[in-house]
Amino acid sequence: MLMPKRVKYRKNHLPHIKGKETRGLKLAFGDYGIQAVGRGYVDSRMIESCRVIMAKNIGKTGKYWIRIFPDVAWTKKPLEVRMGGGKGDPEKWIFPVKPGRIMFELTGVDEDTAKHIARLIGFRLPFEVRLISRV
C-alpha cells in the first residue's frame, strides 16, 4: 500500500475538503481520466483496490497513471479508551479529494473498456466519479 517514506510531523490536522479543486484538473498523461464529482478522503487501500482493477482490465497494451498519493496521517484512538490522553496513533494514510480532481488516467484502451473501469472504480470510492476524455 502507498505511504510516505518519512514525514516531518507524524500527527497532523485533517485538511479541508470544502470548495472545488484548483490543481489536477486537466489530463496530463493519458487519453481518459477518472475525475471526482464528489468530495471525501481516499485512503491507501482504496487506491490499491483501484490500481488492481485498472491493471486487470487494461491488459498488456494499455497504461495507467495514479495521480494522487496518500500523504496525510489519519489517527484513531483505541477502542474503550477514556477521553483525554492526547491524540491517537496514526491508523492509515489518506488523500483529501475535492470535486474536479483527476485521480487516475488511462491510455491504450477503447472507450467501452474505459467506461467499464470507471464504473468499477466508482464502486470502490466513497464519492461519485466520472470518465473524461481528451478527444
From Swiss-Prot:
Cysteines engaged in disulfide bonds, as pairs: none
Alphabetically ordered keywords of this record: Ribonucleoprotein, Ribosomal protein, RNA-binding, rRNA-binding, tRNA-binding
PANTHER family: 50S/60S RIBOSOMAL PROTEIN L16, LARGE RIBOSOMAL SUBUNIT PROTEIN UL16M
Pfam families: Ribosomal_L16
Family listed: Belongs to the universal ribosomal protein uL16 family.
Quaternary structure annotation from Swiss-Prot or TrEMBL: Part of the 50S ribosomal subunit.
CDD domains: Ribosomal_L16_L10e
Natural source organism: Coprothermobacter proteolyticus (strain ATCC 35245 / DSM 5265 / OCM 4 / BT)
InterPro entries: Ribosomal_uL16, Ribosomal_uL16_bact-type, Ribosomal_uL16_CS, Ribosomal_uL16_dom, Ribosomal_uL16_sf
Gene Ontology BP terms: translation
Name listed for the protein in its UniProt record: Large ribosomal subunit protein uL16
